[in-house]
């Protein structure tokens, strides 16, 4: 069976950081082990410290080169030279470095386990809903098949049955119809619940990612503090360590915690900011032309489902308009706007957009089938290229990949470090680095696009847009009718240079 979690960008982000955290934890434990053994070997210092320096060097070979690892390399050299260190140094290391490190690592391990359990629990909800949808679908398909067989039996035997037999079969058909309606509604509700469980899982991943990132920052700061404590004690051991300590002190003075934290974030950076949510679409018995059913009956069964979807689409569209007005009000009035209200409104907008996209994809799929039955041209919709199928035994399943903004930005620079001119540049408001400058190329809108944020352009099919900059995450920056903003690259096609000159 297809795994609905594999291709999720949130999941990849979280797993990447988790692996990075595990490597950092192992490195921290190796450093702590080295310091503990050094404290135990101070009495027989000369021989024991030499062995320990070798072990520290090996530990450094298996970790990423950065400011901290470079400083610890100098610490290893100082161990080789400091053959006359005494027991007082060992006790100081034990009390001021080893004990606090053990406490921090133990606390972090418990927190990471708690975060993993929370992620696993929400992931199981997504998988369970996915499986429930498939199970409910199979049940509905079987019931529909039996219902159709009973329906055809009644239709074909009307003339040969007595009134009593006919009434008996009609009662049976009525019960079958009621059962079918209940199973259909149950399947529809499970399908609609799919997006909420998916959102909850992705939200949990985002929250746990941020928590784990804070733990990694804490671990890096701990290693830096240990180095500083180590430096202070070494400086007390007299002239015999002066030469060695000058080297290690120089290395430690160059330790830049912010640089290592930035390296951590770059190491776990997202290669692509495009996030695609996979959701199952509702498949029905009457859609498959291989299933035995009269054409008119197929149409009569598909139309109520389309009507139901259209009703939900209209409601979701009204909700979206209301949320857009709320976001505009929050943006324009600072008197009642706050970060939490803005975040809550944006979250609701994301949930509503995902629901609306799912409803429209279901509606497009059914409308295409109905158009084939009525021998009409198939409808056009941007989601047509996002709907896929896979086969499982005697059934085929439809699912849609919906592109959504990735809310977790793993590669962020401090705003205080950015020049004031950059912060006011409209093209820098959307995350992601630029792939190329547009050089004022032109492109033509293939589909209508409704802006969801203030920095986005509204597009109508056929609009000619001037491209100023192309972003690597699938969004371009350009201008239309004097207004500048972002728009999705998938909704336009570039025009050749000659067309632009014409």
From Swiss-Prot:
CDD domains reported in the protein's UniProt record: SH3_Nostrin
Chief subcellular location: membrane
Chain positions with Phosphoserine modification: 114, 479
Key word Coiled coil present: yes
Subcellular location per the Swiss-Prot or TrEMBL entry: Cell membrane; Cytoplasmic vesicle; Cytoplasm, Cytoskeleton; Cytoplasm
Coiled coil feature spans: 160-230, 305-335
SUPFAM superfamilies from the UniProt entry: BAR/IMD domain-like, SH3-domain
Annotated ranges, domain F-BAR: 1-260
Compositionally biased tracts (Low complexity): 423-437
Tissue: Over-expressed in brain microcapillaries from spontaneously hypertensive rats.
Domain REM-1: 292-372
InterPro entries: AH/BAR_dom_sf, F_BAR, FCH_dom, HR1_rho-bd, Nostrin_SH3, SH3-like_dom_sf, SH3_domain
SMART domains named among the record's database cross-references: FCH (SM00055), SH3 (SM00326)
SH3 domain boundaries: 438-497
Record region (Disordered): 413-437
Membrane topology note: Peripheral membrane protein
Protein role: Multivalent adapter protein which may decrease NOS3 activity by inducing its translocation away from the plasma membrane.
Subunit structure: Homotrimer. Interacts with DAB2. Interacts with NOS3, WASL and CAV1. Interacts (via SH3 domain) with DNM2; this interaction allows the recruitment of NOS3 to dynamin-positive structures.
Domain notes from UniProt: The SH3 domain mediates interaction with NOS3, DNM2 and WASL. The F-BAR domain is necessary for membrane targeting.
Protein name: Nostrin
Organism from which the protein derives: Rattus norvegicus (Rat)
Upper taxonomic lineage: Eukaryota, Metazoa, Chordata, Craniata, Vertebrata
């Amino acid at each position: 069976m297809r795994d609905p979690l594999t291709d999720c960008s949130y999941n990849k982000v979280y797993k990447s950081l988790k692996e990075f955290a595990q490597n950092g934890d192992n490195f921290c434990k190796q450093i702590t082990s080295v310091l503990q053994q050094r404290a135990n070997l101070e009495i027989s210092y000369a021989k024991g410290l030499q062995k320990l320096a070798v072990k520290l060097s090996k530990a450094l070979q298996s970790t990423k080169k950065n400011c901290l690892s470079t400083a610890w390399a100098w610490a290893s050299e100082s161990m080789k030279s400091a053959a006359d260190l005494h027991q007082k140094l060992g006790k100081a290391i034990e009390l001021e470095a080893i004990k606090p490190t053990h406490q921090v690592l133990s606390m972090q391990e418990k927190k990471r386990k708690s975060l993993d359990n929370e992620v696993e629990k929400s992931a199981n909800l997504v998988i369970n809903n996915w499986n429930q949808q498939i199970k409910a679908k199979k049940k509905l398909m079987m019931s529909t098949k039996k219902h159709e067989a009973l329906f055809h039996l009644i239709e074909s035997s009307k003339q040969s049955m007595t009134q009593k037999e006919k009434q008996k079969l009609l009662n049976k058909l009525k019960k079958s119809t009621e059962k079918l309606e209940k199973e259909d509604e149950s399947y529809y509700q499970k399908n609609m619940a799919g997006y909420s469980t998916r959102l909850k899982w992705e939200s949990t991943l985002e929250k746990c990612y941020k928590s784990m990132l804070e733990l990694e920052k804490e671990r890096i700061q701990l290693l830096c503090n240990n180095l500083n404590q180590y430096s202070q004690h070494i400086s007390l051991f007299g002239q015999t360590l002066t030469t060695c300590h000058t080297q290690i002190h120089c290395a430690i003075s160059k330790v830049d915690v912010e640089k290592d934290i930035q390296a951590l974030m770059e190491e776990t950076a997202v290669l692509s900011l495009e996030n695609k949510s996979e959701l199952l679409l509702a498949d029905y018995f009457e859609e498959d032309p291989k299933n035995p059913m009269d054409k008119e009956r197929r149409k009569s069964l598909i139309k109520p489902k389309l009507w139901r979807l259209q009703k939900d689409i209209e409601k979701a569209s009204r909700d979206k308009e209301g949320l857009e007005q709320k976001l505009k009000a929050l943006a324009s009035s600072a008197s009642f706007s706050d970060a939490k209200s803005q975040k809550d409104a944006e979250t609701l907008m994301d949930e509503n957009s995902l629901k609306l996209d799912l409803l429209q994809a279901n509606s497009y799929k059914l409308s295409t089938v109905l158009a084939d039955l009525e021998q009409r041209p198939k409808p056009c919709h941007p989601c047509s290229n996002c709907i896929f199928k896979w086969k499982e035994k005697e059934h085929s399943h439809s699912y849609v990949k919906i592109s959504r903004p990735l809310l977790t930005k793993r590669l962020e620079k401090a705003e205080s470090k950015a020049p004031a001119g950059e912060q006011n540049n409209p093209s820098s408001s959307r995350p992601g680095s630029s792939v190329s400058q547009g050089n004022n190329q032109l492109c033509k809108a293939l589909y209508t696009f409704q802006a969801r944020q203030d920095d986005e352009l509204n597009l109508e099919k056929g609009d000619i847009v001037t491209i100023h900059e192309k972003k690597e995450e699938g969004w371009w920056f350009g201008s239309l009718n004097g207004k500048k903003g972002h728009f999705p690259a998938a909704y336009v096609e570039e025009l050749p240079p000659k067309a632009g000159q014409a």
